[in-house]
A protein has these predicted regions:
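Nucleic acid-binding interface residues in structured DNA/RNA-binding domains
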Residues: 1-15, 22-121
């Protein structure tokens, strides 16, 4: 699956719908494996720990917050073993969304933004 293809765009739309619904309902966090399974149920093969998963999470985050003022939706997706986001989330938050601080601080602030952005929806 490559960026810019109809297959990729369909997977991105499906991921956005899954994450937005979970954000609105407060049903987060979600593990990478669970997100992968939900996408698979809709016909999208996106392995949990793959480049495609990283790219889709980044693109969905940019889609929902193009100017970086809202939360990165990828904050809800966590590693089963640690219960926190993977390295790709922190890289995205720092390099593309301009977030500052250590991992714990960035994660905490993004979770607050998530709660604030979706509290009244």
């Amino acid at each position: 699956m490559r960026r810019g293809t109809s297959e990729y765009e369909a997977a991105q739309e499906a991921m956005a719908e899954i994450l937005l619904e979970r954000a609105r309902s407060g049903d987060w966090p979600i593990q990478y494996g669970k997100l992968s399974n939900l996408l698979e149920e809709q016909g999208h093969n996106v392995p949990a720990h793959s480049v495609e998963m990283d790219h889709l999470l980044a693109d969905v985050s940019h889609q929902e917050s193009p100017d970086g003022t809202k939360t990165t939706l990828s904050v809800m997706v966590v590693l089963k073993e640690k219960g926190e986001p993977g390295a790709g989330f922190y890289r995205l938050a720092r390099e593309e969304f301009g977030r500052k601080g250590d991992n714990v601080g960035i994660w905490g602030e993004e979770m607050k933004l998530l709660a604030g952005d979706f509290r009244h929806r």
